[in-house]
Amino acid sequence: MININTSFKRIHSLLILTFLCFLILINKTYSEEKIGSVVALKGEIIAINTDDEKRTLDIYDDIFLFDEIVTDNSSSATIQYDDNSTVIIKSSSSLTITEFVFSIAKKKFLGIVKKGKVIIESGKIAKAQEGSMEIQLPTMILGIKGTRFNMKINPDGTSEVGLSEDSFGEVGTINISSDGKVQTLYDTDQVISANIETGISERPKTDDEKKELADASNDLIEASSIDDNLIQEKLEEKLANGTLLDANNDGIIDLSDIDIIKENIKIEKQENINFIAENSTGENTEFLSNVLNQSDEASIGQSMNHILETNDYLVASVITNLSNEDNTFLTTSNVEANNAIKEKIFTQMLSDTDDENNNIAVIGSIFAKSDAESVALMMDTIQTVGETNAHSTLALEVLSSMADSESFYDMDFGDE
């Protein structure tokens, strides 16, 4: 005779065991969710997962949810998260991201800083109206809305926070909660502190603190730019050191894995440049231009093509900035695919009658530095635009502004 109670208990126990295994699996899955990657580092950086397992981080390594990133007294790291937030972790510091959701339905970024100093340039989550970005420090909780800010935990346990303009010239706000009190930080010249004994206080920001926040721009430019040769070099070092992943899962780690990983890195970086372009204005393209100026020519071309399609009002300002830096994207014909993109750029600039004189001067200065092939290639575009706009002197004006170009005198215009 079947004992129903015994069978039921066995089934019940089996269901409980299955449910517990499911919870463990879910927790493991969430803890292994990639949320960002290391884009720059100095010295030894350690990541500690939820199982208290430690791993040494290398350039381009993935960062997972609940990883505690720890630096020692001579190391630092720059992490770029999947919402385009960039975090600079200074020496003797610790950062853990405990929740990261970036979807249409929900946008949330929660982190904990236990010690040291961290600078954050907020990304899409903090800039979204419905987004929520919170960072917990020992004596305060920060609610951030679209800005660059730094946090520091002093040896006496006091937590401090200050904000500054972000890469786009915007200043957001930080809501600071401590011991039941809430204060909002708007002023870039102030630092707000919270101590268990003395509560919330504020003081002027020092010149060194202002400089440190401003100097973070250099780290952000480096983190965002795309240099194919540099990425290749770093990945080859990882291959030689035995830290490269088997990207194609063929059981062999070799140059084919470098190709896959490099392509993924460049895609992520390109998405970040697109984010930078989307948040730039015609009056403030300095950061975007600096990122492009430190990128390789093919990546500049890809970025400029995206800008032409989505943010064409930025084109003239970016090209003006790049022309002042003698950027080879503008002055050489090394990447064939870029020629068509440059034709689009110059066509738009020369068709803009509102700022025609400035654009002609910029294009002339570019051509004065260009190789003969680049100059010859663009002359057809200039002449075509002049005819289309019924402006017969346009080509002559550009040619006049090119008078200092040695390559101009070497050009062969044919027998016409």
Segment roles from a protein language model:
Residues 53, 59-61, 67-68, 73-87, ...:
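N-terminal beta-strand/beta-hairpin edge segment
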Residues 63, 68, 89, 305, ...:
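Residue-level detection of beta-strand scaffold positions
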Residues 26, 66-68, 119-121:
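Short, charged, low-hydrophobicity "junction" segments
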